[in-house]
Curated annotation (Swiss-Prot):
This is Probable transcription factor GLK1. The lineage of its organism: Eukaryota, Viridiplantae, Streptophyta, Embryophyta, Tracheophyta. Expressed in leaves. Keywords: DNA-binding, Nucleus, Transcription, Transcription regulation. InterPro entries: GLK1/2-like, Homeodomain-like_sf, Myb_dom, Myb_dom_plants, SANT/Myb. One of its GO terms (cellular component) is nucleus. It is found in: Nucleus. It comes from Oryza sativa subsp. japonica (Rice). PANTHER family: TRANSCRIPTION ACTIVATOR GLK1 (PTHR31312), TRANSCRIPTION FACTOR GLK1-RELATED (PTHR31312:SF3).
């Protein structure tokens, strides 16, 4: 059997002898061993367990849902200390079956065995402990409390853990249901949100102040914070796009202006004749200045000499010299200018000016025929055919009928071509003959015996 006894009792040796006589094994600690483990709760330094927890960067910044904390607090407050009462187990219930559990002696010893009554009697004969009555009673109370706590701890811990788990499940369900509720940001609600943000400033707006300005009870600070983050991100994106569009517009203007330093190109003239594949017409040459001879011209070898009295002097002394010729001015464009000219008018002798109409060059009429050249056939003169005189109406009708109904020679020639080349398609206007027409033509020509059609 097993007997447990504390080291506080002075008559441990006597009790060991009694237990040995009874055939039981006593487990305990001697006074020498107890001196080595003599410590109290005050000697334990709890600061080592929370070492370096005062630093802010050690613990992560966890998001704690206030709904869960408040739900736990409300559950504890409504229970009214039921958890504490569950842990308190009456001593009578534990010590009632003394025959099965054992006897509690004045020193707080528990004896487990069949002869526990005799062991308790032997303990009473010894006269108890040699300590004071007050100390003995205190030890008895401490031992009873320890036994009660040890025996009641499994059941009480199980019940309290089950209740805590059920409360946590209920609170998590309620908080989970609250988190799933989403806010429908209608255009009116978003407009009020934007007004509140603009009133506070985009950089100084905080969710609590926005919620106060909006004054809507269905919104929470978490909803405002989430929408504010999305609004700032969208606004930043739009500002970046506007800046990029402005930069592109500025670059396009700079390129269109030629970099700013180049002068603006003159507008193209709408009356310019388009030239496709031909160089632009050269500018008209300036009018040559008249040559003035103020002295006697030099004699050229081989030319006859002239009488100096007959040599004309230029300019004459009685005439006033003319001024410079006025610059050439192009003629005004006509009302319907041409936009194309024939290639033969591109020569230097026929350079079209601005607004020259497109018309054919007139052919000069030959007054006299060219003299015949031996060995060359003369070019025949083009003469248009004179239209015939208008005939009577009967002649015109007959001519139209002839034109509509071809002649028999042309029909025979076409039929001969078809018969000689049967693999070619029929010429335009010919159709394959029908059976009725062929039979009628044969009967008309006197052919009576016609073989039946094959197939």
């Amino acid at each position: 059997m097993l007997a447990v006894s504390p080291a506080m009792c002075p008559d441990i040796e006597d009790r060991a002898a009694v237990a040995g006589d009874a055939g039981m094994e006593v487990v305990g600690m001697s006074s020498d061993d107890m001196d080595q483990f003599d410590f109290s709760v005050d000697d334990i330094d709890f600061g080592d367990f929370f070492l370096r927890l005062e630093d802010g960067d050690v613990l992560p910044d966890l998001e704690v849902d206030p709904a869960e904390i408040f739900t736990d607090f409300e559950a504890i407050a409504t229970s009214g200390g039921e958890g504490v009462q569950d842990q308190e187990v009456p001593t009578v219930e534990l010590l009632a079956p003394a025959d099965d559990v054992g006897v509690l002696d004045p020193c707080g010893d528990v004896v487990v065995g069949e002869e526990n009554a005799a062991f308790a009697g032997a303990g009473e004969e010894k006269g108890g402990c040699n300590q004071d009555d007050d100390a003995g009673e205190a030890n008895v109370d401490d031992g009873a409390a320890a036994v009660e706590a040890k025996s009641s701890s499994p059941s009480s811990t199980t019940s309290s853990s089950q209740e805590a788990e059920s409360r946590h499940k209920s609170s998590s369900k309620s908080s989970h249901g609250k988190k799933k509720a989403k806010v429908d940001w209608t255009p009116e609600l978003h407009r009020r949100f934007v007004q509140a943000v603009e009133q506070l400033g985009i950089d100084k707006a905080v969710p609590s102040r926005i919620l106060e300005i909006m004054g809507i009870d269905s919104l929470t600070r978490h909803n405002i914070a989430s929408h504010l983050q999305k609004y700032r991100s969208h606004r930043k994106h739009m500002i970046a796009r506007e800046a990029e569009a402005a930069s592109w517009t500025q670059r396009r203007q700079i390129y269109a202006a030629g970099g700013g330093a180049v002068a603006k190109r003159p507008e193209s003239n709408a009356w310019t004749v388009p030239t496709i594949g031909f160089p632009p017409p050269p500018p008209p040459p300036p009018s040559p200045a008249p040559i003035q001879h103020f002295a006697r011209p030099l004699h050229v070898w081989g030319h006859p000499t002239m009488d100096p009295s007959r040599v004309p002097v230029w300019p004459p002394r009685h005439l006033v010299p003319r001024g410079p010729a006025p610059p050439w001015v192009p003629p005004p464009p006509p009302s319907d200018p041409a936009f194309w000219h024939h290639p033969y008018m591109r020569g230097p002798a026929h350079v079209p000016t601005q607004g020259t109409p497109c018309m054919a060059m007139p052919m000069p009429a030959a007054r006299f025929p060219a003299p015949p050249v031996p060995g060359v056939v003369p070019c025949p003169m083009y003469r248009p055919l004179t239209p015939p005189a208008l005939a009577s109406k009967n002649q015109q009708d007959a001519q139209l009928q002839l034109q509509v109904q071809p002649s028999s020679e042309s029909i025979d020639a076409a039929i001969g071509d078809v018969l000689s080349k049967p693999w070619l398609p029929l010429p335009l206007g010919l159709k394959p003959p029908s059976v009725d027409s062929v039979m009628g033509e044969l009967q008309r020509q006197g052919v009576a015996n016609v073989p039946p059609a094959c197939g």
